[in-house]
């Protein structure tokens, strides 16, 4: 059973039970919200041309948003790629060259910095996660 299946199961059993809590921000999300919001992120990814099998770099802080995005990536059958945001430029470039991801999800600052990093610059689909989350709210679940 995949984690995404377990989330759907828990959404049915206890939709209003807290699924995640971000200790730093006190942000909480229920199983129902997690399933629905991650489905909307899937719709956003599909509109951006991302599909099953694509490799996506996740370059955002760990928190509720991170897990929503990761859940959407897994639901779509894409591959999540994690790169240490504190790594040096050479390491980041090498990771991107080795993996050849189709997309990157990061902050606006990360996307901007990416124009100066060869490895990130080569990634075709650059997604600002804050804007994505805002826009995804208005989309239908997949």
Q: Residues of each region from the PLM?
A:
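Conserved AMP-binding/adenylate-forming
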Residues: 43-87
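Short amphipathic alpha-helical/adjacent loop interface patches that line ligand
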Residues: 38, 42
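Hydrophobic alpha-helical segments typical of transmembrane helices
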Residues: 6-7, 91
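Conserved hydrophobic/aromatic "anchor" residues
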Residues: 29-31, 70
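AMP-dependent adenylate-forming
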Residues: 7-29
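Structural core segment of the AMP-binding/adenylate-forming
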Residues: 75-142
């Amino acid at each position: 059973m995949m984690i995404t299946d377990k989330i759907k199961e828990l959404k049915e059993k206890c939709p209003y039970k807290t699924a995640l809590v971000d200790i730093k921000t006190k942000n909480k999300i229920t199983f129902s919200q997690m399933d629905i919001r991650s489905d909307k992120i899937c719709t956003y990814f599909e509109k951006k041309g991302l599909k099953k099998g694509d490799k996506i770099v996740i370059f955002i802080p760990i928190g509720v948003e991170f897990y929503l995005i990761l859940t959407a990536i897994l639901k779509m059958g894409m591959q999540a790629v994690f790169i240490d945001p504190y790594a040096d430029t050479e390491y980041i470039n090498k990771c991107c060259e080795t993996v050849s991801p189709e997309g990157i999800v990061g902050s606006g600052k990360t996307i901007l910095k990416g124009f100066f990093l060869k490895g990130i610059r080569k990634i075709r689909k650059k997604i600002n996660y804050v804007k994505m989350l805002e826009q995804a709210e208005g989309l239908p679940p997949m």
